[in-house]
């Protein structure tokens, strides 16, 4: 009732919708492609991949109208910032990786990374899974989701902690 846009898609069609939004963003000239290429690789591959995700085709897959898809893409492009939230259920599907990739693609295409009020935000639960990763409470991680097996990551943490890097073991444990 309070949403400006509500896309009531059919179950399992998130990836198609997100790809159609990306298709519109790119094909309607709503993306600063030079900016995307400064921060990521593979834009030409993405464009080629998205050819199959026209609003007309995806409308039939998702249950949305073609106009809803186009309007949503333009709204995203024109917004000062876009912040996407998803919860653990989004990650518990056979398409979880693709769902996350497509959300991240939308943030990248609209320059909504590393800006105040913008970006993708996973709100995981389950005994504070996200918090455990960020503070290094898992055996293979250091704070900031740095890997113990990565020498550069160990060096960064050792420098911050003021200890010799050899004090941080390179194997989980």
Located regions from the model:
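Cofactor-pocket helix-loop regions in the catalytic cores of large enzyme subunits
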Residues: 1-128, 134, 155-173
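Surface-exposed loop and adjacent secondary-structure segments within mature catalytic domains
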Residues: 6, 128, 135-151
């Amino acid at each position: 009732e309070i949403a400006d846009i509500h896309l009531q898609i059919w179950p399992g069609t998130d990836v198609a919708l997100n790809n159609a939004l990306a298709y519109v963003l790119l094909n309607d000239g709503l993306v600063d492609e030079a900016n995307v290429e400064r921060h990521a690789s593979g834009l030409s591959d993405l464009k080629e991949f998205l050819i199959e995700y026209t609003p007309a085709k995806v409308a039939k897959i998702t249950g949305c109208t073609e106009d809803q898809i186009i309007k949503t893409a333009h709204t995203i492009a024109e917004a000062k910032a876009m912040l996407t939230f998803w919860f653990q259920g989004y990650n518990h599907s056979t398409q979880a990786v693709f769902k996350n990739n497509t959300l991240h693609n939308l943030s990248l295409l609209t320059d909504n990374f590393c800006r105040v009020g913008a970006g993708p935000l996973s709100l995981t639960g389950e005994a504070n899974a996200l918090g455990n990763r960020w503070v290094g409470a898992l055996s293979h991680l250091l704070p900031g989701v740095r890997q113990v097996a990565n020498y550069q990551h160990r060096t960064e943490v050792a420098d911050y902690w003021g200890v010799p890097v050899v004090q941080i073991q390179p194997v989980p444990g």
